[in-house]
């Protein structure tokens, strides 16, 4: 079968059997603004094989074709869909195994040349109770979309409600840690309360006229993950020229005003231009908001104009 890979590994080292069948699950939401994050996919894959996420990720990295890139330590933290070296190794190994197509597009790795990883993801999970309820009612496996983990996102553009971060059980009210491997993800990690629609839940609907910034962020992030496979991400050596073009065309060469609008200081801008730092997602979205250009269009503008 094409979707089955045979694992050969020492049982003492991993939780897998000596010879076990590795079934590739289908990622959820591909091509939509709610594409599944790779960590969510790996959690489901680990659960399907009755192993921990740690064991699965360790095993996948060991299968990387280039032995010289294997980390020397035995613990491989992969808790967010970010731009870490570990995530890069997992993506490359999955591509080699051909379990899923373009696993990189289920992470933020395509943006690593232009976007800072710092504070990109939350430490606590966020979710839309209506999404969970709809998936349950439609027989869809509950999962975590890539955008839910992004720090700046706080609304569900699909249902126009605030994302939730705490259990609705009045005797619990616990946040849900991203470090927790507990499945299924639709139940509280502490009290096992259903996190979808329930009698204790208070939905907070978004007034789009008041929360224009949050709506802009949600729409931009949704479009970003939809088009990520076709986006021309600039290379490192192009970033300086693109930033200079933004300053000249949108701010008439006024570097001070540019820094003010995207909330950085001039020293940080100089370091970014020299390739020492990258712009944060917050700064990129602020620039997008001020210029009224979608985040994706900003980089097309810089490359093609």
Question: Language-model segments: which ranges?
Answer:
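A structured, charge-rich N-terminal accessory region that forms the first stable segment of a protein
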Residues: 2-136, 142, 147, 293, ...
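Residues immediately within or flanking Cys/His clusters that coordinate Zn2+
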Residues: 125-128, 150-153, 164, 185
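Short linker/helix segments within small regulatory modules
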Residues: 143-151, 178-185
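Domain-exit/linker segments immediately C-terminal to small folded modules
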Residues: 157, 161-270
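Residue-level signal for the short linker/turn that defines the boundary of a DNA-recognition helix
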Residues: 252-254, 279-282
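Recognition helix of helix-turn-helix/homeodomain-like DNA-binding domains
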Residues: 263-279, 301-304
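Hydrophobic micro-packing sites on short alpha-helices
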Residues: 283-289
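Intrinsically disordered, low-complexity basic tails/linkers immediately adjacent to helix-turn-helix/homeobox/MYB/SANT
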Residues: 289-305
